[in-house]
């Protein structure tokens, strides 16, 4: 049997049934495009929430906004059964604003993990089918954990910036 579906699942994998779910890769699309690097990047054109001190490297007269969308295609096979899902999620919403000279404030929300699974099985025992009719069992789960963060940073010297960030899950 083949199926291709789009649903409101943040992810589609049977492994998300366990624990916190499918842990998201952290960082903006810029960080992901660089292989997930975050600590060593300090750039005036991109927001890097993985390194709070990096937000001081920006124009002191303007704010910055980053909004990302993530789309995935999942294809699962198990013996003769194949299924596919398409998912699209918000990846991040981050805002930075200058405070004073080379200091800045950052606030944002990003996903931490996603849960999304859907299992369906039909009853095959003839005694149960003859007594109750066709029966289909379904397990469905969805959810996510997001992280909200606030941070601030300032330049101590021209080559040294200090930043701190608080994260709420």
Where do the protein language model's features map onto the residues?
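Subset of outer-membrane beta-barrel
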Residues: 4-169
